[in-house]
Amino acid sequence: MHFNLKLNLCLSDTNALKGIALLLLLLHHLFYIQSGLWNDIHLYNGHYLVNELGIFGKLCVAIFVFLSGYGLTIQANKSHKIQLGQFYKRRFSKLYLNYWFIWIIFVPIGLLFFQRTFDSIYINHVWEKLFIDIAGLSFACGFYGYNATWWFYSCIIILYLLFPFLYKLLGKYNFILIMLGLGIYVSSLFFLRAINQYLISFVLGMIAANGIN
């Protein structure tokens, strides 16, 4: 008996999932605050309704990461082979152009209108941290960057770096991929902090695109 479990998402499906993720992202950034800042509804043991809704909204990251793993695998399956240099060039050129564009727009605003100087943000080793932050790797290196919400770039950069090697395990070694993702999640290793919660979502996206035979 032969079977294949595969998730076939069309463009409208992925757009719908992205839309849901964007709504969750909005929920997270609007309502994830420290309890006690306003008259929130107390649920139990120091948990408050609005804050819990904000925490739930961070599910958006897992959805985005799942779709990234899914989309990269669909594209790789079409070409049947990953050209390492070409893959990295295509992915990172687009990623960094977007990231640096955000820097060019928002960092001057922070400096001019909110007194968010590099010294006040990085505290020490300012130039080293600035370079790391411009490279999008601040969260991976143990600190939040100029804007804490940009931590996601560390996550996606590392996942892009890992993808060609994870792809080689796809299919025959799905179990190893899943155990790797779960192992990193459970271990909570500090030097893998940028991906330890999301590698499993990325891997599941890859497996969903490739199918389980």
Task: List each language-model region with its residue ranges.
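Juxtamembrane membrane-interface segments at transmembrane alpha-helix termini
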Residues: I82, L189-I195, A209-N213
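Membrane-cytosol interface segments of multi-pass membrane proteins
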Residues: M1-L182
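Membrane-interface alpha helices of multi-pass inner-membrane proteins
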Residues: G181-F190
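Alpha-helical transmembrane segments and their membrane-interface exit regions
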Residues: S201-G211
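Catalytic-loop motifs flanking and including active-site residues across diverse enzymes
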Residues: V65, I200-S201
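Short, aromatic-rich membrane-interface segments at the entry and exit
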Residues: Y173-I178, L192-I200
